[in-house]
Amino acid sequence: MITTDGNSACATIAHKLSEVLAIYPITPSSPMGDLVDTWSGKSRPNLWGAVPQVIEMQSEAGAAGTVHGALQRGALAATFTSSQGLLLMIPNMYKIAGELLPTVFHVAARTVATHALSIFGDHSDVMACRSTGFAMLCANSVQE
């Protein structure tokens, strides 16, 4: 048995199956970006024996744009986000889905803050993306 948390499990799969990982820290998905950055910094290879390129951007919108650009060039790319960060990625999500480019946005679902800061978990951020054309695969628990 391997003991791990959801962020570590998600980061492991993303690092092994990607060539480009665009990151920008936002709670609660920050540990995923930190882990893949550390692993690439230590030259840990993906499944194809190459070290994924990790690019930290100035915003979530920049991370989504980086993923879009990498996909356009034929790279396997992914990112990590939640809450308001996911909302900033929506314009690029429409383009990525419309161009039928394969990617994964790993989302740690969190309440979209309205009148006050909120760190509670719900699916309001994910539900805001329903019309983008992205296929959504969701787990019922961290273990799944």
Q: How should these model regions be labeled?
A:
Residues 119-144:
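Conserved thiamine diphosphate
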